[in-house]
Structure formats: structure tokens, C-alpha cells
Amino acid sequence: KETATDYELDADIAYHDLQAKYIVSVPKHIAVKDKGGKVYRERSTQINGNGDITNITMHNGDKPSVYDMTYDAYGNLASLTKPENHKGQRMRYNYTYDDVLHTLVTSVKDAYGYTSSTVYDYKWAVPLETSDLNGNKMRYTYDGMGRPSTILAPKELESGRPYTLKFEYHPAERYAR
């Protein structure tokens, strides 16, 4: 319950039942109402057998907004399709993950074919280089403890500068105790 100035709202939440898999906290339906029963927000979800949300429907009057998701064999989000726009078109994003850890997003491709990508340092699971949909690159370096050392943005990369941001740590290469 949330109370604000002159009105009180209740959030009624129902959950999907996957107790056999110990999944008990995935919301199935939520409705936010005032004391008189007027609904201010309402959403519902559908899930797959793993408890992954495959569909979110936001009930906004007569035309609901629908999000659809798919997952890969590792349980990572493989695609996200957003609600229709005014022309009935839906934007879709496809996600690709690394072949080593199967957890780091290496590329995102949208419905227009635009792609952004990331190359990682697997020791720290941090980006070494990113490339946006326009081909602009950023590069990152890290110290021996996985902390950022330098960040090189597109403008400085193009002009041959050594960094855009540089970090120093004192004392260097030591863990806090």
C-alpha cells in the first residue's frame, strides 16, 4: 500500500506457481487500484517452464501494449520485441552472448539490422572495446585488480590520443583490508 496526499492505492499481485522448481516470485498479474476500485495500472505476464517471462501485457484500455521475450539454451534473453507503434510495427532486439562464459552480451541487433557490439576481458568480465550502431568505438583498459585504468572515446581514438579518461589508484595494486 502506498498513501499519497488525499488518496490511497492498493497493489494486488498474483504470482505464477512453479513451486516444484522453487520459483515462487514471478508476478503473474498486478493491478494498482484506489479505494473505489478504479484501476490505475494493470500488467500481466506469461512464463515458460523455466520460469522465464515470455510475455508482458500492459493493459491500457482497449489496446494493450505487449512485450515478447525469448531465451537461449543458457536462460539468457535472446530477443525482446516491443509493443506496436502507431503503424502496427514492433521493434525487435536480438542478443548474442559470448562463447566462453555464455553470460556476456557480445552484440545487439535491432529490427533494422543496426548492430552494437562488445569485446570482453574474460578475467574480469569487463568490456575491452564497444562499438555502437554508427561504428563509433570506445576502448577500455584495466589495472591488475580489474579497476578501470583508461577509457578512450571515439573522438580521442580517431585523433590518436592515449586516453579520454585516466584513473590512478593509491595505493596501486592493493586490496583494501
Task: Locate the predicted segments by residue.
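Acidic, low-complexity segments
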Residues: K1-R177
